[in-house]
Amino acid sequence: MNKEEIIKEFQIHEGDTGSAEVQVALLTARIKHLTEHLKKHPKDYHSRRGLMKLVGRRRKILKYLRNKNPEAYKEVIQKLGLRK
């Protein structure tokens, strides 16, 4: 999935590129990509640190979304398959 497809799927209204839902979806795509990279290159510690920063940023945005709009939080979690 490329960036435009992710934005179209999660945007709230036309032209929405910065809502919490879109940000979480884009971060999730980057996290998945970096995770695959680290499976091939396990000693790439620089990328591993970047991955940890992305995960932390996604966690903060999800916490914000959970507090502000629980319904949207549940929908995003379900669509992305993040929580069990």
Swiss-Prot record:
GO terms, biological process: translation
Residue ranges annotated as transmembrane are none
Q: Which InterPro entries match?
A: Ribosomal_uS15, Ribosomal_uS15_bac-type, uS15_NS1_RNA-bd_sf
Enumerate the Gene3D superfamilies for this protein: 6.10.250.3130, S15/NS1, RNA-binding
One Pfam family name is: Ribosomal_S15
Task: Extract one GO cellular component term from the record.
Answer: cytosolic small ribosomal subunit
Q: Which PROSITE patterns match?
A: RIBOSOMAL_S15 (PS00362)
Q: What does the record give under GO molecular function?
A: rRNA binding; structural constituent of ribosome
SMART domains xref list:
Ribosomal_S15 (SM01387)
Q: Does the keyword Lipid biosynthesis apply?
A: no
Going by the entry's taxonomy, the superkingdom of the source organism is recorded as Bacteria
Could you list this entry's UniProt keywords, alphabetically sorted.
Ribonucleoprotein, Ribosomal protein, RNA-binding, rRNA-binding
Briefly state the protein's biological role: One of the primary rRNA binding proteins, it binds directly to 16S rRNA where it helps nucleate assembly of the platform of the 30S subunit by binding and bridging several RNA helices of the 16S rRNA.
Q: What quaternary structure, including any partners, is listed in this protein's UniProt entry?
A: Part of the 30S ribosomal subunit. Forms a bridge to the 50S subunit in the 70S ribosome, contacting the 23S rRNA.
Which NCBIfam families does UniProt cross-reference here? S15_bact
Instruction: Give the family from UniProt.
Output: Belongs to the universal ribosomal protein uS15 family.
Q: Which PANTHER family match?
A: RIBOSOMAL PROTEIN S15, BACTERIAL AND ORGANELLAR, SMALL RIBOSOMAL SUBUNIT PROTEIN US15M
Official protein name in the record? Small ribosomal subunit protein uS15
Q: Which organism is it from?
A: Thermosipho melanesiensis (strain DSM 12029 / CIP 104789 / BI429)
**What would be the name of the gene that encodes this protein?**
rpsO
